[in-house]
């Protein structure tokens, strides 16, 4: 499953939102990736997510693949919205 989001957090996906996303993604067995500007990272890796340098207004994609992919996609969407990280495009 793939969803596209736009970052609304004024400081982008920095340490705090990255930590929240990684924590949520780590609850699932599925492969969960985040893609920005042609680069892809494992959403379960704080260093990978931070290295992408996703700023406010940027579009990024989250892909989930595996046994619990649908549940993972819903959970990640909920975190992105509830934490003010971004909104689904």
Please place each PLM-identified region on the residue numbering:
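Absolute protein N-terminus
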Residues: 1-3
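Compact, glycine-rich, soluble single-domain proteins
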Residues: 6-56, 64
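C-terminal structural segments of small proteins and small subunits
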Residues: 53-89
């Amino acid at each position: 499953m793939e969803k596209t989001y736009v970052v609304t957090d004024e400081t982008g996906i920095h340490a705090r939102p990255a930590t929240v996303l990684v924590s949520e993604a780590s609850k699932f067995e599925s492969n969960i990736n985040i893609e920005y500007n042609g680069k892809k990272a494992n959403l379960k890796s704080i260093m990978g997510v931070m290295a992408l340098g996703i700023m406010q207004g940027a579009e990024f994609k989250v892909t989930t693949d595996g046994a619990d992919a649908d549940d993972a996609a819903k959970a990640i969407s909920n975190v992105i919205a509830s934490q003010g990280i971004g909104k689904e495009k």
